[in-house]
């Protein structure tokens, strides 16, 4: 490969390394405080509110949202709530308020009628 083609490639690689060094590392795992980070929508502003759980107030966890790191209310149990494609039949009342009210690995999630109940999460 000619040297004239290597110069732009080297410049791009150097720029990439500099950008990586500018972003503070984020644990993203939230291992310091109980619970797990919820599934968050990507924040295009690349907000860096925290680097670790201890940077967040009270029970909030430092969680990744795309290129951002924000303090967020944690989920108590692993997994995410399944999507609801259509209204489902069943009891249309709230059967739980938080994951800890659900047995085993089940989570407290929205059901088909706008209320919440214990369901098997997606992993």
UniProtKB/Swiss-Prot annotation:
Epididymis. It is found in: Secreted. GO terms for cellular component: extracellular space. CDD domains: WAP. Glycans are attached at residue 45. It comes from the Eukaryota. One of its GO terms (molecular function) is aspartic-type endopeptidase inhibitor activity. Keywords: Aspartic protease inhibitor, Disulfide bond, Glycoprotein, Protease inhibitor, Repeat, Secreted, Serine protease inhibitor, Signal, Thiol protease inhibitor. It holds the Pfam family WAP. Gene3D superfamilies: Elafin-like (4.10.75.10). Disulfide bonds join 37-63, 46-67, 50-62, 56-71, 81-109, 92-113, 96-108, 102-118. Residues 30-71, 74-122 form the WAP domain. SUPFAM superfamilies: Elafin-like. GO terms for biological process: antibacterial humoral response; innate immune response. Residues 1-28 form the signal peptide. InterPro entries: Elafin-like_sf, WAP_dom, WAP_four-disulfide_core. Homotrimer; disulfide-linked. Broad range protease inhibitor. This is WAP four-disulfide core domain protein 2.
């Amino acid at each position: 490969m000619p040297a004239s083609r290597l110069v732009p490639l080297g410049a791009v690689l150097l720029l990439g390394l500099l950008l990586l060094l500018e972003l503070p590392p984020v644990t993203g795992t939230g291992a310091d405080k109980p619970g797990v980070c919820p599934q968050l929508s990507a924040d295009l502003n690349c907000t860096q509110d925290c680097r670790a759980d201890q940077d967040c107030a009270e029970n909030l966890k430092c969680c990744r949202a795309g290129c951002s790191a924000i303090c967020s209310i944690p989920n108590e149990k692993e997994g995410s709530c399944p999507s609801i494609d259509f209204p489902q039949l069943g009891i249309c009342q709230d059967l739980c308020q938080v994951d800890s009210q659900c047995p085993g690995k089940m989570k407290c999630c929205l059901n088909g009628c706008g209320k919440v109940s214990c369901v098997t999460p997606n992993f």
